[in-house]
Regions:
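Long, low-complexity, intrinsically disordered segments enriched in glycines and aromatic residues
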Residues: 78-197
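A surface-exposed partner-binding patch
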Residues: 1-134
């Protein structure tokens, strides 16, 4: 996996200590996030920030550094309150590999040939890497992608699981599409200092 991807994962709060470069599958499986991921577009809405401010006004008025520390801890906790964030969850999905736990899961929904119209890869073995509250709500890579350093990310939605697929770009572009905790805090601070809490 490209070093730039690993660097961005760490900037986003992920742990890459277990990444060895052995294989794409092993590297993706070794990545750990204990926090959600916020897409870059989140800063335009900052869903939940005003409500958090309303609930913590006394702290905001008396100790802004503590308020912002608590704000960051709240929004980057491993929780699933619907703020428009995404969640890194790395699990193997092998619906066409005989004797795998997923074998046959897509039977009657989509064929390997239909998937190959969008997905490039010798074997259709996938690592699901993320889900979100948006559309699509599941993201994955094909483990036999020709570019093992920076594979293509695909998207699908639970309502049309794998019968409708979209190319979302490279893995590097995918992770670059999220904001860091520092970027989140800067946007929230600007919003509160210049707007609602002024």
């Amino acid at each position: 996996m490209k070093q730039a991807i690993l660097t961005q994962i760490r900037r986003l709060g992920g742990n890459t200590d277990g990444v060895t470069g052995e294989s794409l599958q092993a590297d993706l499986a070794a990545i750990v996030f204990k926090n959600p991921l916020y897409p870059a577009g989140y800063v335009a809405e900052l869903i939940g920030v005003a409500e958090f401010w309303e609930q913590h006004q006394p702290l905001y008025q008396t100790d802004r550094p503590a308020f912002y520390q608590r704000l960051l801890a709240h929004f980057f906790a491993d929780q699933e309150l619907p703020y428009g964030q995404a969640f890194f969850r790395n699990f193997l999905f092998t619906p066409f590999k005989e004797d795998s736990p997923d074998y046959g899961e897509l039977a009657g929904l989509v064929t390997p040939d239909e998937i190959r119209q969008v997905v490039a890869g010798a074997d259709l073995d996938f690592m699901c890497i993320c889900y979100s509250y948006g559309f699509p709500d599941h993201y994955f890579v094909c483990l036999t992608d020709a570019d093992q350093e920076n594979p293509t990310v695909y998207g699908t939605d639970h309502e049309v699981f794998f019968s409708e697929l979209t190319k979302e770009g490279t893995l590097e572009a995918f992770f670059n599409g999220f904001i860091t905790p520092e970027e989140f805090l800067a946007a929230a601070t600007k919003h509160l200092e210049n707007g609602k809490a002024a």
